[in-house]
Design a protein with these regions (language model features):
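Subtilisin-like peptidase catalytic core
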Residues: 105, 143, 149-237, 289, ...
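Acidic-leg catalytic submotif of subtilisin-like serine proteases
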Residues: 84-156, 175, 229
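Catalytic-core environment of secreted peptidases
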Residues: 147-148, 198, 287-330
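Autoinhibitory propeptides
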Residues: 2-76, 120, 452, 463-466
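Hydrolase catalytic cores
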Residues: 14, 175-176, 196-201, 227-228, ...
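C-terminal subdomain of the subtilisin-like protease fold in secreted/lumenal serine endopeptidases
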Residues: 3-9, 19-24, 35-43, 226-231, ...
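Substrate-binding/access-modulating region of protease and related hydrolase catalytic domains
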Residues: 95, 179, 197-281, 291, ...
C-alpha cells in the first residue's frame, strides 16, 4: 500500500500587507527672461536623469512578482522570485485552456484565490434537456461513469465532494494556479490555469486504499483530457498497475510531475514511486531552500531525480480562505507543474510531454549544490523555460563557395555552416531530432536572419535521457 503524503506544516497565519503607490509630479513655470533656455536645458537634463532612474528601477524590479500583481502576500512567496516567476509572467500568464490534474487531498472549492481557476467539465456544465443545471442534476450527463463531476472527483468517497480535510491539496493547488491580480493572498505559478481536482486521500476516512485511488485518479485524468498530472504522494513499493496507468498517460502525451519524496534517502538506491518509474513523461522533483541546498528531508538521486524547485516554507492557500507555509517535495513538484502549464500554453505544446520535459530540464539554472543530487544539476527557472522557445538565432555573413562563412549564434543549440563545392548549407537539429537543411545560394547575405523562420527549434541539451 502506498504511504501517505509526507510533509511538514511550519505555520498558518493571517497576512496583512500595506501597499503604497507613489506618484511623482514635476512641473514649473518658465519666464521670458534670458535664462529661459538655460532653465529648459536644466529641466531636460533633470527629466532625462529621472527617466534613467525609472528605467534602472524597472530593470531591477522585473524580478519582483509584486511589480506585476497586487496580491498582498506575494512578497512573502520567496519561491516565486527564486524561480524567476515575474520575468516569466512578462512573457505569459498561462491559459485556462491548460488543464492540470491535481491528485491530492481535495480542495477548498470556495477559496477566494482558487474558485475562479477550477476546471469545469464541459459535459457537466450548462443546462440539461429539462432546464436543470448539469452540475447538480444527479445525472451522468457526459456518460463517463461519474455523476456531476463538474470540477473533478473524490475517489475516497466515490462522489463529487472535493472538500479538503487535510489542507495539503488546497496548498498544492494554490502554488500551481492561485488567481493573480485579485488583491487577495498570493499568485500561483500559472495564474490562469484550469485545476482538475482528484481526491485520493482523506485523513478522516480510515483504511483508504491510496494506491487504488491513485490509479483511478490517473486514469480519470487521462480520460478527461488533462495535459499535466501533479502527484505529490508516493511510496517505496513498485506497482505494475500504477506504472501502466502512468505509461498510458505517456502514450497520450500527458506530462506526469511527481514528488521525489521526503524519505531523506538516495532514490538511486532506495526507489520511490511513481517518481522513479522509467517513463519519458515523468519529471521527478526534489526540494531546495532559498540558498539552493536540497532539504535534508528530501530524496535525491543523480539518475532518478530530474530537477529541484523551491520547497521550504512555501506560502500558499489553505482551507477557509486562509494561507500558510508548508515544506517538502510536494511544494517543489507544484512549482514544476505550474511551469509546465506556462510552457504548454505559450507555444501550444499540448500532449507533447517529452518536449515540454526537455525544455524545463535543460533551461534550469545549474548549481554546484545540485551536482550530486539531481540528474541535471539544475533548479527550475520559469523565465528561461519560456524564452528558449522564443529564441531566434541571429547570425551574419556571406554564403560563399568553398569558404567557411563566419557567423555568430545567440541561440541555445546554435547552427553550423558546412563547406560545399557549389553551395553553402545551414544545418541544425530541428524539432528534437529531425534534421533540417536549408540550402542557400552562393552570395546570399544572411544578416540577422531568424533561424526560427527556417523552422528551427533550438534543442535543449540534457546530459542523460531517462
Amino acid at each position: 500500500m502506498k504511504k501517505n503524503i509526507t510533509y511538514t506544516i511550519f505555520a498558518t497565519f493571517s497576512i496583512f500587507c500595506l501597499l503604497v503607490v507613489g506618484h511623482y509630479f514635476y512641473g514649473g513655470t518658465e519666464s521670458q527672461s534670458r535664462g529661459t533656455q538655460s532653465l529648459k536645458k536644466k529641466l531636460l537634463e533633470k527629466r532625462e536623469l529621472e527617466l534613467g532612474q525609472v528605467k534602472e528601477q524597472t530593470d531591477k524590479v522585473i524580478d519582483e512578482p509584486s511589480a506585476l500583481f497586487n496580491d498582498p502576500a506575494i512578497k512573502q512567496a520567496w519561491g516565486l522570485k527564486k524561480s524567476a516567476a515575474a520575468r516569466a509572467w512578462s512573457v505569459t500568464q498561462g491559459s485556462s485552456d491548460t488543464i492540470v490534474a491535481v491528485i491530492d487531498t481535495g480542495i477548498d472549492e470556495f477559496h477566494e484565490d482558487l474558485k475562479s481557476n477550477l476546471w469545469n467539465n464541459p459535459g457537466e456544465s450548462g443546462l440539461d434537456a429539462n432546464g436543470k443545471d448539469k452540475a447538480t442534476n444527479g445525472v451522468d450527463d457526459d456518460k463517463n461513469g461519474f455523476i456531476d463531476d463538474v470540477h473533478g472527483w473524490n475517489f475516497v468517497s466515490n462522489n463529487n465532494k472535493l472538500d479538503d480535510n487535510h489542507g495539503h491539496g488546497t496548498h498544492i493547488a494554490g502554488i500551481i494556479g492561485a488567481e493573480a491580480g485579485n488583491k487577495k493572498g498570493i499568485s500561483g505559478i500559472s495564474p490562469k490555469v484550469s485545476l482538475m481536482i482528484l481526491k485520493y486521500f482523506d485523513p478522516k476516512v480510515p483504511s483508504t486504499d491510496n494506491l487504488k485511488n491513485t490509479i483511478a485518479a490517473i486514469n480519470y485524468a487521462v480520460k478527461m483530457g488533462a495535459h499535466i498530472i501533479n502527484y505529490s504522494g508516493g511510496g517505496t513499493d513498485y506497482s505494475q498497475e500504477e506504472h501502466d496507468a502512468v505509461e498510458l498517460a505517456n502514450k497520450k502525451g500527458i506530462l506526469f510531475v511527481a514528488a521525489a519524496g521526503n524519505e531523506k534517502s538516495n532514490s538511486d538506491q532506495h526507489h520511490y514511486y511513481p517518481a522513479d518509474y522509467n517513463l519519458k513523461n515523468i519529471i521527478s522533483v526534489t526540494a531546495i531552500d532559498p540558498t539552493t541546498e536540497v532539504l535534508s528531508s528530501s530524496n535525491y538521486g543523480v539518475t532518478t531525480v530530474d530537477i529541484a524547485a523551491p520547497g521550504q516554507n512555501i506560502l500558499s492557500c489553505l482551507p477557509n480562505n486562509s494561507y500558510g507555509l508548508m515544506t517538502g517535495t510536494s511544494q517543489a513538484t507544484a512549482f514544476v507543474s505550474g511551469a509546465a502549464a506556462l510552457v504548454m500554453s505559450h507555444k501550444n505544446m499540448y500532449f507533447r510531454a517529452p518536449e515540454v520535459k526537455k525544455y524545463i530540464l535543460a533551461t534550469g539554472d545549474t548549481a554546484s549544490s545540485l551536482i550530486a543530487k539531481t540528474r541535471t544539476s539544475r533548479q527550475l527557472n520559469l523565465f528561461k523555460s519560456l524564452t528558449i522557445l522564443d529564441s531566434e538565432t541571429q547570425f551574419s555573413g556571406i554564403v560563399s563557395t568553398g569558404v567557411n562563412t563566419r557567423f555568430t549564434s545567440e541561440s541555445h543549440g546554435g547552427l553550423s555552416l558546412q563547406n560545399d563545392p557549389n553551395l553553402q548549407k545551414v544545418n541544425s537539429v530541428a524539432n528534437f531530432g529531425k534534421q533540417l537543411i536549408e540550402t542557400l545560394n552562393p552570395g546570399t547575405q544572411i544578416k540577422k536572419k531568424s533561424a526560427n523562420r527556417l523552422g528551427i527549434v533550438p534543442e535543449p541539451k540534457v546530459e542523460q535521457e531517462q
